[in-house]
């Protein structure tokens, strides 16, 4: 959804990416957000 509200699917994907990056960095996912 370019320039619009992201769909639930896009939001979930973004959240999964954040969690994966946080896990790789050894940080708490909530600290990244």
From Swiss-Prot:
Keyword Ion transport carried by entry: no
Membrane-topology annotation of the record: Peripheral membrane protein
GO biological process, one term: mitochondrial electron transport, cytochrome c to oxygen
One annotated Gene Ontology cellular component of this protein: respiratory chain complex IV
The protein's annotated pathway: Energy metabolism; oxidative phosphorylation
Keywords: Membrane, Mitochondrion, Mitochondrion inner membrane
InterPro entries: Cyt_c_oxidase_su5b, Cyt_c_oxidase_su5b_sf
Subcellular location: Mitochondrion inner membrane
Keyword Lipoprotein: no
Function statement: Component of the cytochrome c oxidase, the last enzyme in the mitochondrial electron transport chain which drives oxidative phosphorylation. The respiratory chain contains 3 multisubunit complexes succinate dehydrogenase (complex II, CII), ubiquinol-cytochrome c oxidoreductase (cytochrome b-c1 complex, complex III, CIII) and cytochrome c oxidase (complex IV, CIV), that cooperate to transfer electrons derived from NADH and succinate to molecular oxygen, creating an electrochemical gradient over the inner membrane that drives transmembrane transport and the ATP synthase.
Complexes and interactors: Component of the cytochrome c oxidase (complex IV, CIV), a multisubunit enzyme composed of 14 subunits. The complex is composed of a catalytic core of 3 subunits MT-CO1, MT-CO2 and MT-CO3, encoded in the mitochondrial DNA, and 11 supernumerary subunits COX4I, COX5A, COX5B, COX6A, COX6B, COX6C, COX7A, COX7B, COX7C, COX8 and NDUFA4, which are encoded in the nuclear genome.
Family label: Belongs to the cytochrome c oxidase subunit 5B family.
Name of this chain's protein: Cytochrome c oxidase subunit 5B liver, mitochondrial
Native organism: Oncorhynchus mykiss (Rainbow trout)
Taxonomic placement: Eukaryota, Metazoa, Chordata, Craniata, Vertebrata
């Amino acid at each position: 959804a370019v320039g619009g509200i992201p769909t639930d699917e896009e939001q979930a994907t973004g959240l999964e990416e954040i969690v994966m990056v946080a896990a790789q960095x050894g940080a708490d996912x909530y600290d990244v957000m």
